[in-house]
Regions:
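Hydrophobic anchor residue at the start of the ABC signature
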Residues: 93
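Conserved signature/switch motifs of ABC ATPase nucleotide-binding domains
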Residues: 78-81, 99
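Conserved H-loop
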Residues: 133-139
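Conserved beta-strand-loop-alpha-helix hinge in the C-terminal portion
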Residues: 158-186
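Helix-to-loop junction immediately C-terminal to a conserved catalytic motif
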Residues: 16
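Catalytic Walker B motif of ABC-type/P-loop ATPase nucleotide-binding domains
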Residues: 104-107
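Conserved ABC ATPase "signature" region
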Residues: 33, 61-75, 126-127
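Helical segment within the ABC ATPase nucleotide-binding domain
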Residues: 118-132
Length: 195
């Protein structure tokens, strides 16, 4: 979590091996089946929604439920040029979920989505995380989104982790109007120097 330009995306790209660090190292405890969702959907324009989602998977690994889970049923044969920005992003999310990863890296994946679709995607992400015990490194500039989705929230400023917060309430019981959430949000805002 952090303001624009603070190093959130760079951290994600370093963790995913898309960039190399100037110093230090990132270690993995074991091999992970990893998926990446970028800020901008990276779809192949010559493939349909369905073909983009199942690209690289064997026939037995394909699950039409992933398209349904992101609210794109009926658009399987559509091409990216026929989709809105939010629909393209949901296609990219479905592709990541179809891979059934153990580790998902997501760079502001819900930023282009309307409120209702964002809420639906947050619930689906939590379901996948609980069902698969998947670890998720989620980059956002939304404090509310971090509080709803995160178990640990790292506040980044100028490329450094400035503060680390643990959200103790079970995810299915989280309410942004509860005292714990209000207190955490206030602490995070104070750490980000918004006030």
């Amino acid at each position: 979590l952090g303001q624009s330009g603070c190093g959130k995306t760079t951290l994600l790209r370093l963790t995913g091996g898309l960039e190399t660090a100037d110093s230090g190292e990132i270690r993995w405890e074991s091999a992970h089946k990893t998926a990446f969702v970028f800020q901008e959907p990276r779809l192949m324009p010559w493939l349909t929604v369905w073909e983009n989602v199942v690209f690289g998977l064997s026939k037995k690994e394909t699950d039409p439920g992933k398209i349904e889970a992101v609210g794109l049923s009926g658009l399987e044969k559509a091409y990216p040029s026929q989709l809105s920005g939010g629909m393209k992003q949901r296609t990219a999310i479905a592709r990541a979920l179809a891979y059934e990863p153990d580790f998902i890296m997501m760079d502001e994946p819900f930023a282009a989505l309307d409120y209702f679709t964002r809420e639906q995607m947050q619930k689906e992400l939590l379901r996948v995380q609980q069902e698969r015990s998947a670890s998720i490194l989620f980059v956002t500039h939304s404090i509310d989104e971090a509080l709803i989705l995160g178990s640990q929230i790292a506040v980044i400023e100028k490329g450094m982790v400035k503060a680390l917060y643990e959200v103790k309430a079970p995810q299915e019981e989280r309410n942004l109007l509860e005292d714990e959430m209000i207190t955490l949000k206030r602490d995070i805002i104070n750490n980000l120097h918004f006030i």
